[in-house]
Amino acid sequence: IEHLQNCGLVSAVAILQMLDRNPGKSFADLRRALPTTYGSPTMSPYCADEEKYGVIDRIIAEVQADADSGQTVIGQKIVDVNTVNGVRFTLEDGSWGLIRASSNTPNLVVVVESPTAKKNTVGIFRDIERRLKAYNEVGEFDQKI
């Protein structure tokens, strides 16, 4: 359901389809069956519109180089790097971090999630925060975890 979080109508259709595929189960039953995940709020450090896409390009190169060289984040190798609309890196246990340019504000967007532990979300955020501090173009976060 992760990719549906930004569109209410698409989410509603997906929920109805899940209910249709699972006759005899309520929405509450289906929700209880979902695995627990530990996610962050959307965190947005300032980055000027004219700078943010260049910063993201450099972050993409940095994360890809780390993945290629076997570097770790929270003690886990980066097993996937998705560069569609920013960079999303996935770790061995399925935990991930996302850094992208906001499409409508002078900010970057940072989100992290782990299927295994809250401490992993905090650790991934600390790694992203460390990376972003290296860029003078990136300001303070609006919130942190």
Regions found by a protein language model. Give the residues of each.
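Phosphate-binding and adjacent anionic-ligand microenvironments
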Residues: 1-103, 107-111, 118-145
